[in-house]
């Protein structure tokens, strides 16, 4: 992706504001002009967007779009640092507009006070280079992914739950797209942010990572998180990278976004009951230990996703469970699907429970 800097010039004030950028070898004058020329759209103005918007505006990005139809609620304030008590009941995008202008008065800010859906997504994103996806549901992510794919836009994905966050960059230089990680055919469903807990600072961290990836793409520096999912666990202060296996022979005209998932056999809870009655099985719960202790399926064992690639666990599953049917699961399929791809890569036969 290239950014035309022929028409971009830095004012005297901008040279003062971005002085610490300009002395960096990988940025300098031309890099700052690229940031100024970039056009970034945020879909969602919640916790992830809050930190990313602030830093990108402060970094000198001169065109930012924000799409969200939501209003500020008291329950937002612990993680959505763009807002305060006085903003409760107001449209988020109006407040975001004012905050960006306070930080970067020269920034061209476009706000869309509507829900992004299959009918308006392509229209909204067409004038931007990068789409930062801060939504909290699968339906919106699939719509964003498809629109970015068809219009050749970089899709920067982030998600949080509890003390854990995920981030990846999709559709970058013919790299994987969101459906390669979570195929639509699985009919995945996950509770939205207002239905489960999340530590506020987790959203800030992942949002900043999204901003970092956007800046790396714009500047053409570093290793972009394309083809990998980065998983950050706040409690362990750990980072894990998981490779995303892309579909083969993709082209714009014929790619189907509801591709069947070929990595493993997916079973329902009803199928599980039938298999249990006929075969020896081993249920592997890939959630964190504290989640497993609170609730788990009968006779399940716990191998957290972050540990599933260890030599010890691979040896255990490949050699000690050879006479058993391996079934992996988690609460919402997010982590079990990643675990399934890892097992597939290591040629370990298994089933994925659509729980």
From Swiss-Prot:
Top EC category: transferase
Which CDD domains does the record cross-reference, listed alphabetically?
Answer: RHOD, ThiF_MoeB_HesA_family
Q: Which reaction does it catalyse?
A: [molybdopterin-synthase sulfur-carrier protein]-C-terminal Gly-Gly + ATP + H(+) = [molybdopterin-synthase sulfur-carrier protein]-C-terminal Gly-Gly-AMP + diphosphate
- Describe which pathway this protein belongs to, using the record's wording: Cofactor biosynthesis; molybdopterin biosynthesis
> Which cellular component terms (GO) are annotated to the entry?
chloroplast; cytosol
Q: What is its main location?
A: plastid
Where does the record place it?
Plastid, Chloroplast
Q: At which positions is ATP bound?
A: 47, 68, 75-79, 92, 136-137
> Keyword set for this entry?
ATP-binding, Chloroplast, Molybdenum cofactor biosynthesis, Nucleotide-binding, Nucleotidyltransferase, Plastid, Transferase
Keyword Transferase in record: yes
List GO molecular-function terms, semicolon-separated.
Answer: ATP binding; molybdopterin-synthase adenylyltransferase activity; sulfotransferase activity; thiosulfate-cyanide sulfurtransferase activity; ubiquitin-like modifier activating enzyme activity
State which Enzyme Commission number(s) the record gives. Answer: 2.7.7.80
Q: Name one GO biological process term.
A: Mo-molybdopterin cofactor biosynthetic process
Where does the Rhodanese domain lie? Answer: 277-355
Similarity field: Belongs to the HesA/MoeB/ThiF family.
Query: Its function?
Result: Catalyzes the adenylation by ATP of the carboxyl group of the C-terminal glycine of sulfur carrier protein moaD.
Q: Matching PANTHER family, A to Z?
A: ADENYLYLTRANSFERASE AND SULFURTRANSFERASE MOCS3, UBIQUITIN-ACTIVATING ENZYME E1
Q: What is the name of this protein?
A: Probable molybdopterin-synthase adenylyltransferase
